[in-house]
Amino acid sequence: MEKSATRQKALLIALPLLFSPLASAVQQAVLDTRGAPLITVNGLTFKDLNRDGKLNPYEDWRLPAAERAADLVSRMTLAEKAGVMMHGSAPTAGSVTGAGTQYDLNAAKTMIADRYVNSFITRLSGDNPAQMAEENNKLQQLAEATRLGIPLTISTDPRSSFQSLVGVSVSVGKFSKWPETLGLAAIGDEELVRRFADIVRQEYRAVGITEALSPQADLATEPRWPRIDGTFGEDPDLTKKMVRGYVTGMQNGKNGLNAQSVISIVKHWVGYGAAKDGWDSHNVYGKYAQFRQNNLQWHIDPFTGAFEAHAAGIMPTYSILRNASWHGKPIEQVGAGFNRFLLTDLLRGQYGFDGVILSDWLITNDCKGDCLTGVKPGEKPVPRGMPWGVEKLTPAERFVKAVNAGVDQFGGVTDSALLVQAVQDGKLTEARLDTSVNRILKQKFQTGLFERPYVNATQANDIVGRADWQQLADDTQARSLVLLQNNNLLPLRKGSRVWLHGIAANAAQEVGFIVVNTPEQADVALIRTHTPYEQPHKNFFFGSRHHEGSLAFRNDNPDYQAIVRASAKVPTLVTVYMERPAILTNVVDKTRAVVANFGVSDSVLLNRLMSGAAYTAKLPFELPSSMSAVRNQQPDLPYDSAKPLFPFGYGLPH
């Protein structure tokens, strides 16, 4: 009843005015409300969000976003301003990360009504888009009931590909399923990336998401780094082009935000990919990005694609840039979220960025005890804090340092009491908070949230994962395959007898193969595997989830054993999911064909292997020849390992 009443109210407002004399001068905005009263001024209708019976400038949809934001800030208390600078994790019952299918509305109400938080990341499942949309509507209803009626910005990590990892990405559910961004980079088509992001934008808006914590503009210069599969590879020029296309599609154009945009938060400024020894800076043991030379410019260049597309947000890296300097001047040894040079002097000053700087999650929290050492055997690790370089400061001092560095909003935090206290104690000025709050609220106005915070949940299932979009996603999966080796094996013939490892038998049968039980019975063996990895840090929350360490196939690797077994009996094709650059030296000497993939379904893969069409995708990073070469390359430089087995840009046509 409530949903249909909301829609009915919006229609009653909009339709009569289309035929009024006022329509020729000012067209009535469509307004959605589930609680805020409406007022009429000069024949036009507005929301009375603060319920004072008057039309205030921030409620006037005719005014520019900047003017509305300034008026709203002038009406806010210090606590309300501090709340805007928090970006929480939308709570679900029984999950510390916010995973699940329904929000904990009581916990959410505390955050929204009592702590004044109005930005949240959602980690809800996408298996039921209509339910997800209505859950987000419920959060917006809580926000509409607050004193000023400020709507929520709901964000998400990527949820459109094969990867799913807490703190990185979300399971795809019913959303269209594409290759990882590495696959888009392998294709190298900026317009395709724009189209991909435009589709994702429409899916996000359909379920009430208006902010994407993506893309990664990080350069994959350290082959062991666990976050490579979220990047566009290791080439600055290619990554710049891909990032520009992504932001353009996500924000619905190159000219800044509009009412159909999804805010793009480009990350992680800057140098994150130069991870020392490949360890990730979500973890204390990986808090350094290693710069052996002054190579920071390599890592900055991809972000210029974001600036050209007027990206609305930037997220700083957790990492400390060890040994990095800028024009001979050393860079302060603190994480980028605390680094005034990186955020204010370089990002805002030199590169002119004027959007929102959103910190990565939990940078003001402590990292003590098992956060430093890992939990004891049998204990379950939980996420703590990432205050790298400022561990000795108090949480209150970290807030002050981050704000003074240039941070506008704090990821993963909902308690703003320390920020309020810092202003009351004279450590920060309220005017400085006003600057950040203005930036954040302006984007809410630009994206149309004050007029239309709700979505039509009944339409979400028809929009999310649309058949024509998934067909394009499947075509993109196929295009992204990189042919590394083919000794007269491809294309495969329909009706061939195949022995499978890592591929579903029904998928092979559906495309016309005959599945057999042993390699000896087969005409060809088809093996799916992934880049090898180790997990030496299972006693750390993120370390227990990251794929770290060696990139080489060891003799005890079950997939490698399948390769050895099959290739001794029958021509063998191996496809490797390249979440990191795999070392294939002891694979290519056994196989007849090798295909790199970056996320592909069995059916798309098998159909492509039977096609005689030329392969056009190219490697977005080099594939090293050995772990010795990996250890000896410089983590801050692209494509610099000795004698790579396959260089950057490699790919056979046939």
From Swiss-Prot:
Its main location: periplasm. One of its GO terms (biological process) is glucan catabolic process. SUPFAM superfamilies: (Trans)glycosidases (SSF51445), Beta-D-glucan exohydrolase, C-terminal domain (SSF52279). The active site is at D235, D360. This is Periplasmic beta-glucosidase/beta-xylosidase. Pfam families: Glyco_hydro_3 (PF00933). One of its GO terms (cellular component) is periplasmic space. Belongs to the glycosyl hydrolase 3 family. The keyword Signal applies. The lineage of its organism: Bacteria, Pseudomonadati, Pseudomonadota, Gammaproteobacteria, Enterobacterales. Residues 1-25 form the signal peptide. Keywords: Carbohydrate metabolism, Glycosidase, Hydrolase, Multifunctional enzyme, Periplasm, Polysaccharide degradation, Signal, Xylan degradation. The gene is bgxA. It catalyses: Hydrolysis of terminal, non-reducing beta-D-glucosyl residues with release of beta-D-glucose; Hydrolysis of (1->4)-beta-D-xylans, to remove successive D-xylose residues from the non-reducing termini. It is found in: Periplasm. Exhibits both beta-glucosidase and beta-xylosidase activities. Its EC number is 3.2.1.21, 3.2.1.37.
